[in-house]
Amino acid sequence: MPQRLEIGDERTNRLVPSVASADEISVDVTLTGEVPAWRAATGYMLFGADRSLEFAWLPSVPQGTVAIRYTVGGDEHETTGVGYHDHNWGNVGLMKVVHDWYWARGQAGPYSVIASYVTATKSYGSEPIPIFMLARDNVVIGDHPTKVTFEREGIYTDDATGKPVARETSYLYQDGDDRYAVSLTRRRDLTRSRMIDSVKGLKHIAARLARFDGAYLRFAGDIEVSHHHGGELVDTYADEALWELMYFGHAARDDIRGET
């Protein structure tokens, strides 16, 4: 189905099928940004002594609303939901610079969250790259990476991929007397895939010879956002959320352990 993207104002993206000929189905999706477009610092991660290798990422709609109108066989339907939209680009393959990352987004009460913890490959010092955006009532209130502490608890080895997985990940943001804690607790797995299994033929053989061991896992569970000021609890909100673990590299021996 051919599509075109119509850009409205800076807060609205509209994806419109230009031809409705696929089994008498047409779809009209309007994504309206609530949290303004955002980027972590410059949006670029730079690697190498000369900083010539780059990977960039921009959430153009960190949190938004979606209105959908779709027609099936002449019957028109409408529904609504929440939405997100981002872009990424670069001049180097991720597997060369990134060992693994956790990435999550969610909403709980008035809070909207984007949180990620990237670990560079050993060639680049296994450096941690925290990314964090916290908005309240659609206004960003915290996004400085040096104020973020990342924690993992309940680590076990996923038997399908052989990768270490944390049952709970937490992002702690300390800004003066204000402390925000974002916790994600896994309830079930949505995806557990070894990337090599999707590669066929000669590429599969080449990947095995290169000892490629990439995996992708996606989880469903609970997000909790709490705010303390001067040690006193201000508020706590919880909801459901999705997040992922992209693991390109080999698992370190110390990270591998059984299910607990």
Predicted features by range, described:
Residues 1-260:
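Structured soluble/peripheral alpha/beta segments that form catalytic or ligand/cofactor-binding pockets
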